[in-house]
């Protein structure tokens, strides 16, 4: 951490650590009020996914705009772009595969648990993801990853571009910030459990996040605001610049029932039927993932998709941590003053959702209807 002689923070690590401590304090207060007294520590887990482009260095050296700005400033559109969606998750070529193998080796030597890599939507665009970790550590790992990524690419005669919009006509690059809370024994506070409708703890933390994103939406948006990233957001290739949350049908119906009827209605179980006897009926993934939403609940975490590929994930997580901590403080104050904690928990869930459900949008974030509704 870097700070001045007078104690002013000179980097993003100090504010990030402060935000995690504030969030830990309020989360422990809420858990204690709910009777969960065993928890002593709260860990803010994040898992950034890093997108990037690879360009052959001999072509890179011929482009002054790429060398000076990290992006193209002029030129023609490629003869073939991403129209057929045939690049995404396609077979990785030998040259890039060898590069990725060495990249993984170098990252593992640094203690960075790189796990997955695949082709992204645009030609020569790729992604690497690491195993989630505590926010402070994961932020450091992502900074190191970007540096090692560029260094290893040069060894293989390529240049890794981290600019959010290096080429016109194809997708830009970002990084998805997967965010969740857990106790020191590994209990995920955003895991719905088997009886979702009866899990008041989960519903309380869920609605607290919803309220935080609504009340502090300008800060959450500012966390992803850079010149390069603003050029990428909202162009039907990345999440829209309007802050919204995708919950999925089941969670939305349960929260609507609490608001309208005062109790939890059990969500309908849905199954995927392939019409083939050799394949069983499988439970439908009720969280979907709605790629047009800037923030989506994906099973046991929230995925914040607006962060730019060259950004530090510290800033966005400082804002998310601080916003959620502020709302949890309100919840803790109410629970600690309540005579009937369970009843008050129901009331908090209802109040948080009823007052801030406007930020929930499960439809197409690129549609004109959503832009009109958001206004």
Question: What does each model-found stretch correspond to?
Answer:
Residues 1-162, 167-175, 180-375:
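Glycine-rich, acidic/polar active-site loops that bind/position phosphate-bearing ligands
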